[in-house]
Amino acid sequence: MELSAVLTPAPEGGYVAFNPETGTTTQGETVEDALQNLREATELYLEEFPLSIVGRPLLTSFQVPEHA
């Protein structure tokens, strides 16, 4: 099953990884670490809450005005 991952640099270093389909969030020192941790956290989540029960969210984008 292919799922989404959103990785954001953490202010204190490393990366925060988020899976929008399940809401699982974790972190890691490198992109690879963060993705591996997210994979493990998401697998554990899906054992209890399969996507067939939870459903998939609608991912879209929106715009906000830029401020100087």
Regions found by a protein language model. Give the residues of each.
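A short, exposed loop/beta-hairpin motif centered on an aromatic-Gly-Thr core
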Residues: 22-32
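Short, charged, surface-exposed hinge/linker loops at domain edges
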Residues: 1-4, 32, 36-68
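Short acidic, gly/pro-rich beta-turn/loop elements at beta-sheet edges
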Residues: 15, 27, 36
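Short aromatic-glycine-(Arg/Gly/Cys) micro-motifs in beta-strand/loop hairpins
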Residues: 4-21
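A ubiquitous, low-specificity "background" feature that marks scattered single residues
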Residues: 8, 25-27, 39, 43
